[in-house]
Regions:
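Nucleotide and nucleotide-moiety/phosphate-recognizing core
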Residues: 4, 8-9, 53-59, 63-101, ...
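Short, non-helical or kinked segments that cap or interrupt transmembrane helices
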Residues: 31-42, 102-115, 142-150
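Transmembrane alpha-helical segments that form the membrane-embedded catalytic/substrate-channel core
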Residues: 13-22, 90-101, 177-186
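N-terminal signal-anchor transmembrane alpha helix
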Residues: 2-27
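Interfacial segments of multi-pass membrane proteins
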Residues: 44-51, 72-75, 92, 96, ...
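Membrane-embedded alpha-helical segments of multi-pass transporters/permeases
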Residues: 21, 69-70, 102, 138, ...
Length: 206
């Protein structure tokens, strides 16, 4: 079983290194991280390339996340730990997304990954976290604030639904905490009133 765990964790982490924003910006012979906030995430991509190509970013990041959860789950299923495997795979793909060794450890903040981890593990958690994100975003136009509160809700969802499964619950807490940690600079700007509002559903560039 330990070999399956090691292989699953490594595969999930490496899948996390496949960053959608970096991949699509590379098609333009560019690097999204050289623009705006310097972050390899969906928001920075939309700000600099518009939302028409954002779908490809979403597909890549969603695909790698779901695949990581599935692979890790299948590896541990013979040992009776399918749910735990999916959750561990989700945690490691998020770590790989945030700290990608193949991209100089300059990755994204993990919000999109967190959403699809929630979908892969328990759709109820994903729906609640997404509802919080959208509610806060439409009320304030602050993607970062919606992301932080959505990530916090993700963790709370795992606590609520999996309090009887310590490993799954702890993985969920760590995932939410990691996403919040990745937004630490945004949190400081929010507190200082310097955070930039974003119109995700309005084209900036075509």
């Amino acid at each position: 079983m330990w070999l399956a765990i090691v292989v699953g964790l490594l595969v999930s982490y490496l899948l996390g290194n496949l960053n959608g924003a970096v991949c699509i910006s590379a098609l333009h012979h560019d690097d999204v991280r050289s623009h705006g906030s310097g972050n390899a995430g969906l928001t920075n991509f939309i700000r600099n390339y518009g939302r028409r190509q954002a779908l490809y970013v979403i597909l890549i990041d969603a695909g790698k996340t779901v695949l990581a959860c599935l692979v890790m789950g299948l590896l541990l299923e013979p040992y009776g730990y399918y749910l735990e495997g999916r959750t561990l795979g989700g945690l490691m793909v998020m770590v790989g997304h945030a700290f990608p060794a193949l991209l100089g450890f300059r990755g994204g903040k993990g919000i999109l990954s967190g959403l699809f981890i929630g979908i892969s593990v328990d759709w109820r958690i994903a729906v609640i976290a997404l509802a919080v994100f959208l509610g806060i975003y439409f009320a304030t136009r602050y993607v970062s604030l919606g992301s932080v509160l959505g990530a916090t809700t993700l963790s709370l969802g795992f606590v609520l639904f999996y309090y009887d499964n310590l490993l799954v619950m702890l993985c969920g807490i760590v995932m939410g905490a990691l996403a919040v940690f990745m937004h630490r600079a945004n949190i400081i700007r929010l507190l200082q009133g310097k955070e930039r509002k974003t119109h995700l559903f309005r084209n900036i560039k075509e």
